[in-house]
Amino acid sequence: MTNKEVLDNASLQRALTRITYEIIERNKGGQDLVLVGIKTRGEFLAHRIANRLEQLEGVKIPVMAIDITNFRDDVLNHDDSLGLNDEEKTNIADKNIVLIDDVLFTGRTIRAALDALIHIGRPNTIALAVLVDRGHRELPIRADFVGKNIPTAQNEKIKVLVQEIDGRDAVEIVH
């Protein structure tokens, strides 16, 4: 297998900054906004976007991370647990949610995340932000905020590297 870097650290940072500005424009600041990162890498991206929002708008935005494993359509034993402790639970009722993930591919992870969010409350709106949209949708799901569109072949994979886990920031196509 070979890896081809398609976003370096600087490009990844610019993509997150662009997403942040688009979130500000859409939400007219940060009031009633909650960022929800899909574990694992979406969680780190959500925190980074929240930090940028705080720097730009002077408002601290709540960030929540959800584990959607039990809401996936390929998991047989559902226990409807999000793996959240009480400190991690944020009231999402009547809030404007931005759901954040690293890669949008078939749409199945996002569908599971939507099910998980509805399970814990009824938000006012839900928007989707992804660092990379690679196409090949199996469900009618579209991101509202996209860092970079990277068309791929069906047999290729997108690998998002984040400093917090991988020691560097980059996006690679794996052949």
Curated annotation (Swiss-Prot):
E.C. designation(s): 2.4.2.9
Protein's name according to its UniProt entry: Bifunctional protein PyrR
GO biological process, one term: DNA-templated transcription termination
Reaction equation(s) it catalyzes: UMP + diphosphate = 5-phospho-alpha-D-ribose 1-diphosphate + uracil
Gene3D superfamilies referenced in this protein's UniProt entry, alphabetically: 3.40.50.2020
Originating species: Leuconostoc citreum (strain KM20)
UniProt superkingdom: Bacteria
Gene that encodes it: pyrR
Record's subunit section: Homodimer and homohexamer; in equilibrium.
Motif extent (PRPP-binding): 97-109
